Amino acid sequence: MLILVLVAGLSLISIHLPLGRDEGVAAYFGWQILQGKVVYKDLYHFNLPGIFWTYALALKLFGLKPEAVNLFDLCFRLFTLIGIYLAAARLFGRRSALWGSAIYGLFSTVVYNSYWQNAQKETFALGASAWCLYFFALGLGKERLRNFWFMLAGICGCGAMLYKPTVALAPGLLGLYLLLGNRLKIKARLLGVTGLAAGFLIPAAALIGYLQSQGALSEMVRQVFIFGTAYGGQYYSGGLKVLGLMLWKISDWTMAQGFLVAGAVLGLWGLVKEKDPNWKPAFWFGLGLFLNILVQNKYFTYHFMVLVLPGSIFAGAFLGRVMPRLFSGSARLMRAAVWITVLFLMGANLKPDFGRYGRELLYDLGKISKDDFLEKYGKWGFGDISVTAQYKVARYLKEQTAPEDKVLVFGLEPGINFMASRSAPGKFTYDLPLTYQFGSEKLKTYQARLKKEFLRELGAAPPVYIVVVEKDTSTIEPRDSYEQMLEFVEFKNFLAQNYYLETKIEHYYLYRRK
């Protein structure tokens, strides 16, 4: 209970965090879903829909504002924490579970409940993954309703996949462990794998049926498997450079989270030494989550969030079970020194991220203005967005337009549409599918079709404003959106013929319809 209160309290301090770019996209999609739009059919995106439906639920429950997302993120983190506690308790006992859930609560909140890290796809995939591991552990240990527990594990595994497809490697390795291991008799193993697979297929079939009923299934296939795979494929180009990046990023994260990694390794070592068979499902599950990072080959901070789950469970087993046995015969002073060292190392890992709470508290208490608070978030020229500039643009658009008016933001920031409460004129709410410069000839042909569809939408329902962003380059967009607009000749001509430059707010050109 204490760790739940601590996690909730720290999270509430951060309740006013602004939306990062990814969160802005998901917030806009969630709002549009509440307006009756269907992902893929009415809203173009190459991700699976779990994150957008989750944001829609958050906005429905708590209102159309960033705080709604942060509050839902808090609730979901508590849900995940409970799942981790139950899974760890089932595998390694209550004492280990208490330590594991405490470690998860602190690291997931202090490190990952911050600007641009919170409410990511990984956040919600973690919750489903934790409960997947718990139900799988129940199936291993309980003969009664065994196949039902495995089926629930499969359902949760598919739920995690709806946020992040590669996370499915974790329940997949659990299935292999169940099939090839010797924990159960062969008949029980086969039935268990069947239950796991059936559970996985139930929500997958429901998703396919829903999208087909909405006329969005074929569009989902095109957006996710044509554009999405081409977009993801860019991260594999570069030969040895890719391998070097992988090793560097993993090493950097390992050093930054040294307490978590060292605790997990020591916990795993102790459990193997004790010949506790339950280390195996937890290890294979954690390996699947690690392979998920390698397969997608992306290494932003939030991509490593999934490793906090197995890391916390094994580190909790070390503190709650392995370490007390190691030092059971030691003098009291020795045990105290060990615990002081553990707490010091944990504090050293968390200290860099604790610094933000002071500023957040000042804003919560009304001691600094909103503009001063937002100024910290985002810096031009670092592949980032300026939150302050976004709010200025959104405020201006809201003042100059009616609620029913349409606004197109030609960039990567439909979060401006969300903040201004102004819908985009069509399904293309950000420019990446139209301007992405890598990929095969097949992708280029597909892109040409998208551009024609984009221009048809603009011609049929021209927005009151078109906002074009400059200097928004990043690792995924090496050229800024303004330059890409100039190279998109048909769009540039449409803009010149039908719009005039009304004003410029920082790096945002605001063109108004003539």
Predicted region positions:
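Transmembrane-helix motifs of polytopic, lipid-linked glycan transferases
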Residues: 71-95, 99, 106, 131
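Extracytoplasmic
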Residues: 47, 165-167, 214, 339-514
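Hydrophobic, aromatic-rich transmembrane alpha-helices
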Residues: 82, 249-277, 282-283, 287, ...
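Short helix- or helix-capping micro-motifs
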Residues: 7, 100-109, 157, 161, ...
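Perimembrane helix-loop-helix junctions
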Residues: 170-201, 268-275, 313, 319-329
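Membrane-interface alpha helices of multi-pass inner-membrane proteins
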Residues: 148-165, 170-178, 198, 202, ...
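Specific aromatic-rich, kink-prone transmembrane helix
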Residues: 124-142, 149-152, 156-157, 311-314
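Hydrophobic/aromatic-rich transmembrane helices and adjacent perimembrane loops
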Residues: 169-170, 290-292, 296-332
